[in-house]
């Protein structure tokens, strides 16, 4: 396979994995208090640029197939895209890169949760709940994903 095909394939696998993990773990992936385990994949833009659109597509698929309202589909996907772009831009600054999904999803998805699902819960609390779940996925699980992917021989990743 040529490089373009490999890149496209890696992106498709990342998108599918994100959507599948989110849907399989739906009870904890959606709602006021959520830990979206698939968000551990948000470390991948550090290693590969194709992960940026792949994560956004995976999030879009998970939110559409998960039955989310349009407001959540649009702004949840936007939060993931912005976080992935910033993670990629900050790839040489690991701590800052890992914090981007926590920041963007905490603010944007926290607002979505408040306005779409839980208007009785104060907005700052919704943001805090989402950021806490993101922290578990991105700051605890993300480095494990990063370490595992780094162990894959480079010729297998970038053939």
Q: Where are the language model's segments positioned?
A:
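Hydrophobic transmembrane alpha-helices
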Residues: 1-53
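Juxtamembrane loop-helix boundary motifs flanking transmembrane segments in multi-pass membrane proteins
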Residues: 1-4, 56, 119-120, 124
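Membrane-embedded alpha-helical hairpins and interfacial helices in multi-pass inner-membrane proteins
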Residues: 27-32, 40, 60-159
């Amino acid at each position: 396979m040529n490089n373009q095909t490999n890149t496209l394939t890696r992106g498709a696998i990342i998108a599918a994995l994100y959507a599948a993990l989110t849907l399989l773990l739906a009870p904890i992936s959606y709602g006021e208090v959520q830990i979206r385990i698939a968000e551990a994949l948000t470390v991948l833009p550090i290693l590969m640029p194709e992960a940026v659109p792949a994560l956004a597509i995976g999030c879009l698929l998970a939110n559409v197939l998960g039955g989310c309202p349009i407001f959540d589909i649009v702004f949840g996907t936007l939060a993931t895209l912005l976080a992935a772009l910033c993670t990629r831009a900050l790839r040489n600054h690991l701590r800052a890169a890992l914090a981007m999904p926590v920041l963007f999803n905490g603010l944007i998805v926290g607002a979505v949760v408040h306005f779409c699902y839980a208007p009785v819960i104060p907005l700052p609390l919704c943001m805090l709940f989402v950021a806490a779940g993101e922290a578990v996925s991105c700051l605890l699980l993300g480095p494990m994903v990063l370490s595992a992917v780094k162990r894959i021989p480079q010729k297998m990743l970038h053939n």
